[in-house]
């Protein structure tokens, strides 16, 4: 009983920290976008506009949240929860340091892939429940996009699993004490980051909510707290993808050999996640949005064959090295 209560307390604290980190990430993104676009960005609320995300949160919470006419009320309300909850659950198995994971399970990689794949159900459910043609088109795009990118997302990780010999995130980090897997799996790391951006519906892969042709896609009819949950889920998904990339390819909480002992593991982990997240922001600020057919063609005709080739080559090398 005491153990369950302690787990509940730690889980609540982790969720609160994630909410603050996600809010801070929105501020960082807006400041970076302002710098890239040669403007100031948020600079009024708090020092350097840091409290802008707090003001935005209050604004979202105080807005009316009412389903549109003809919408399925139950599905409309449940959809944002279905989209955000798996992302929060995914952080439960992320190892922020040696022994610093809410749940250290042996199949952490599979669990995270499953949680990332579940988010699309919330998007599709919200699109179908909104009773809007723009939302419906956005939901269909999200489903087709996830089918294409989820395939090589999983394949890009199998090379790491082969080298580490484990599906446990902690064991994978321990296997990188001598060399980070990004040096052994550069193609796998690149493919994973591409698929991760697509799974989080971020530019240039935000076709499900493309403002140019779908108003706001599956978010068209959402306001208030429901919109806020979708928004929160998207930014947490970016941080989850960055955390998984750091864990699998960049040594997790392990620092470089010549600097590792001078900083605690969680600090190294946070710094690496921050760098990956900044790269995702840079991608959003600089790359154009492709056409939908180009997006799907890239997934099935370029990325998937490359992921299969990388997996085959890794398998051959692992077998050759293990042969007597």
From Swiss-Prot:
The chain crosses the membrane at residues 1-21, 77-97, 109-129, 147-167, 179-199, 214-234, 238-258, 263-283, 298-318. Its EC number is 7.1.1.-. It comes from the Bacteria. One of its GO terms (cellular component) is plasma membrane. It catalyses: a quinone + NADH + 5 H(+)(in) = a quinol + NAD(+) + 4 H(+)(out). It is an enzyme of class 7 (translocase). Keywords: Cell inner membrane, Cell membrane, Membrane, NAD, Quinone, Translocase, Transmembrane, Transmembrane helix, Ubiquinone. PROSITE patterns: COMPLEX1_ND1_2. It is a multi-pass membrane protein. Pfam families: NADHdh. The keyword Zinc-finger does not apply. Its main location: membrane. InterPro entries: NADH_UbQ_OxRdtase_su1/FPO, NADH_UbQ_OxRdtase_su1_CS. It is found in: Cell inner membrane. One of its GO terms (biological process) is aerobic respiration. The keyword Transmembrane applies. GO terms for molecular function: NADH dehydrogenase activity; oxidoreductase activity, acting on NAD(P)H, quinone or similar compound as acceptor; quinone binding. NDH-1 shuttles electrons from NADH, via FMN and iron-sulfur (Fe-S) centers, to quinones in the respiratory chain. The immediate electron acceptor for the enzyme in this species is believed to be ubiquinone. Couples the redox reaction to proton translocation (for every two electrons transferred, four hydrogen ions are translocated across the cytoplasmic membrane), and thus conserves the redox energy in a proton gradient. This subunit may bind ubiquinone. Belongs to the complex I subunit 1 family. NDH-1 is composed of 14 different subunits. Subunits NuoA, H, J, K, L, M, N constitute the membrane sector of the complex. This is NADH-quinone oxidoreductase subunit H 2. It comes from Rhodopseudomonas palustris (strain BisB18). The lineage of its organism: Bacteria, Pseudomonadati, Pseudomonadota, Alphaproteobacteria, Hyphomicrobiales. The gene is nuoH2.
